[in-house]
From Swiss-Prot:
Annotated localization: Cytoplasm
Function: Induces bone resorption, acting probably through a signaling cascade which results in the secretion of factor(s) enhancing osteoclast formation and activity.
Organism, as annotated: Danio rerio (Zebrafish)
Keyword set includes Cytoplasm: yes
SH3 domain mapped to chain residues: 12-71
PANTHER family reported for this sequence: OSTEOCLAST-STIMULATING FACTOR 1
Name listed for the protein in its UniProt record: Osteoclast-stimulating factor 1
GO cellular component term, pick one: cytoplasm
Gene Ontology terms describing biological process: signal transduction
UniProt-listed InterPro entries: Ankyrin_rpt, Ankyrin_rpt-contain_sf, SH3-like_dom_sf, SH3_domain
Keywords: ANK repeat, Cytoplasm, Repeat, SH3 domain
Per-repeat ranges for ANK: 72-101, 105-135, 139-168
Keyword Repeat: yes
Pfam families: Ank, Ank_2, SH3_9
Length: 214
């Protein structure tokens, strides 16, 4: 008895699979791929033939092949970010894989890149216009919490330069500064927090001055 076909992808949502066997096309429209190749399925509107991309080539793949002879990769961007795999990350971005997707623990790919100290991956993710900097996972931690806890001061600085929030507290009521494990991270976070406090104080004084002048 064959497995039921996978649920169709939502419009605009790319589903990613790893091929378990080589597929030999019978027509020019069909996509050739080998065992172990990554398949990016972008269009599942036809129940029999899905549109996919592999190694930069686009073509049709029988949906029953995907159901029976391919392994779903639920969070490819997260896997690439965890491993610091730049080429896979770029491939995910080229194939429109969602950048802010959450895994089961509520982590984004940016969180895993920060957690792993993969500066080059962090740089690419931060260059994307819709990258969510302050997403909290199920423990309440943000990418900034992860970088501070792991002691990656260069990544902390990159996040702060993109205006990551320093006032977010996790489930244990800790900010990124509370979790900083080295002096360099703590210093960067204190400086940023100091700037925020100074600006807030300055704004408050301006407000009071306005009140007095009324």
């Amino acid at each position: 008895m064959s497995k039921p076909p996978p649920k169709p992808a939502k419009p605009g949502q790319v589903k990613v699979y790893r091929a378990l066997f080589t597929f030999d096309p019978r027509t020019p429209d069909e996509l050739y791929f080998e065992e172990g190749d990554i398949l990016y399925i972008s269009d599942t509107s036809d129940s029999n033939w899905w549109k996919g991309t592999c190694r930069g080539r686009t073509g049709l793949i029988p949906s029953n092949y995907v159901a029976e002879q391919a392994e779903s990769i639920d969070n490819p961007m997260h896997e690439a970010a965890k491993r610091g795999n730049l080429s896979w990350l770029r491939e995910c971005l080229d194939n429109k894989v969602g950048i802010n997707g959450l895994d089961k623990a509520g982590n984004t790919s940016l969180y895993w890149a920060c957690h792993g100290g993969h500066k080059d991956v962090v740089e690419i993710l931060l260059s994307q216009p819709n990258c969510e900097l302050n997403q909290q996972n199920k423990l309440g931690d943000t990418p900034l919490h992860a970088a501070a806890w792991k002691g990656y001061s260069d990544i902390v600085e990159m996040l702060l330069n993109k205006n990551a929030r320093t006032d977010v507290v996790n489930n244990e009521k800790k900010t990124a500064l509370d979790m900083a494990t080295n002096a360099q991270c703590a210093s960067l976070l204190k400086r940023k927090l100091g700037g925020v406090i100074l600006r807030t104080h300055s704004n408050a004084e301006e407000y009071l001055d306005d009140e007095d002048s009324d």
